[in-house]
Amino acid sequence: MIIYNVTINVSDEIHNQWIKWMKEDHIPKVLSTNLFVSASLNRIISNKDTGTTYAIAYKIESLSLLQKYETEFAPKLRNEYSSKFLDKAPAFRTIMQVEDKF
């Protein structure tokens, strides 16, 4: 199992708009690709930065499926995101492999 983690620091001035858009538009669009098993929206509570930081963890079965997402779907979805929020909610991505569950 692969976890595709997107970490985003959201400016206070757009927080409510951002959270609504992510829950009602962006995350459902990512899941509608039918490549991901699930997603969770997580608020990072140990962060001392200004604004609020979130980590969205998307679970996907394999790196090959993630590559398919990156090639076929991500460019359009990232463009939509960038046109709305990039300067007020920058994101970075981390890809993790689940080694074991307890």
Which residues are covered by each model-predicted region?
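Short amphipathic alpha-helical segments
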Residues: H15-S40, K76-N79
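Short N-terminal helix-initiation segments at or just after the protein's N-terminus
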Residues: M1-T7, L35-N42, A57, R78-L86
